Amino acid sequence: LAHFLEHMLFLGTQKSPGVDEYGAYMNDNGGYNNAYTAGDHTNYFYEINHNAFEGSLDRFAQFFIAPLFTEEFTEREMNAVQSEYQKNLENDSRRTYAIQSLFYRPGHPEQMFGTGSLETLGNVTRKELLDFYEAHYSADRMGLILMSNEPVDSLAVWARRHFAQIENRDIPQPRYPSDYLVDKPTFRLIQIEPVKDIRTLELEFDLPGFADTYLSKPGEMLMSLIGHEGAGSLLSLLKKENLATGLTASSYLATLDYGALSIRVELTPEGLESYRDVVKLCLSYIDMLQASASPAYHFQEQRTMAALNEIYSDKGEGAGAVSRHAGNLVKYSLEIVDRVPYLYGDEDPAPYHLLLSHLRRENMLVTLTAKGVPTTDTETHYGAQYSYSEDAAFYQELTHLPSRPELRLPEANPFIPAAVSIPVRAQSDDVLPLRVIDEPGLTLYHSLDTQFLRPKASLQYKFRFPLERMDLRFKVLLDMYTTCVNESLNELAYPARLAGLSYSFANGYEGVYFSINGYGGS
């Protein structure tokens, strides 16, 4: 219903009743607009030429002051929602989430079908829309981000002028149960037949809300440790045992009250057959983390890189930036919405250990996705085939896992810059490279950054082969060679990537191209 309401707000207001008037104003002034509905908020955003910005604010604010909810266009917007739903029918991520939500806590909002369709919205009345609008759309539950070349004082005047009329209904923020996975002393397994030919294993754990711990970043700490790819990492051992080709750990804050952490493993064919061994290794790594002290050096490394990235990274602009900041307003104060990823305080291991303590066998839901897995049921909305089982005996086995000495915390990262400062030199438009070496078989150019003055370096190497050797067989062998080199370097290169360094080693038209980019300095 929230998603459908998002669509209906674009259908005219009392001040601008034309159903396409808002969109036409955007198009006429080089702009575009969009919106999305998440689990706990709806986010409206747009960008437009600067000279039309105040006019757009006047029109946009009316969405939240006097929308028409034009009944004659209800069917059109239902079909638009249906179209969004249909385009994702073969999206494996959507299909997987729809199935996983079937096994969440009954009645929890995380169980709800989020997109909507003609079937689920067909009986929605205009009164229901208005009731929902009045129950949730209130000035005290809204946030506004403006970005323009106008002075901040002018933007403040415009904000008051156009948005002050939004009614404040004094509606409290909605609260949600923090545990959407019911604790069960059993191994819960979902098996899904995918559309694409993929093999993945996902371990999901629900977490309590942790927005107030943004200075200690416990979610980011867990992600970076579990998802590490260096020596002693979970992925390193999975690769050595030929069980996986990749691994991603992610934590997210769905609402102020709850979040989740998931470990997604890309399986080899052997890993698919031995998926239970993969589960054991994942839990063994978590056991190792729970038995270890919080790695203070790792926190300091993340804090250092966050400080560097705040200064030197591209922050984005336009609709993407304001949408991101407005989304942060749901969980963070206005003063920090643009700095949340970069803000670190002193190390506080308590929030880290609290989240880590929630990675338990009892609140774990495992999803195995691959062609040919046994299925018994069909999900209603996406038609995906799946099966669900519980195994108390395997759960007991998982509670008594032996430690694996191969699994350990990552070493201190030697690539983290100890100190980086802005280069002290004058800006100049003279950016032509200088040829410093010109010998048979070797040409070297150097170009000094005199424009952006960032403490970054870029090294580019090209190893050229005689064109007569670059036949199809040679290119295939070269591709295999570069793939093997990249794989063999991954454990070394991963800490470098964490330190803002990246490299590329790939075959090209003339031979092998090798590049290194990132922070320069000590």
Residue ranges with predicted function:
Residues D197-I226, G232:
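Extended catalytic-interface subdomain
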Residues I145, Y297-T450, L459:
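C-terminal regions of mature proteins
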Residues L9-Q14, N27, G31, A61-F69, ...:
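Sec-exported extracytoplasmic/periplasmic mature domains
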Residues F132, S154-A156, E167, A211-L215, ...:
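Short helix/loop capping segments that flank catalytic or ligand/cofactor-binding pockets
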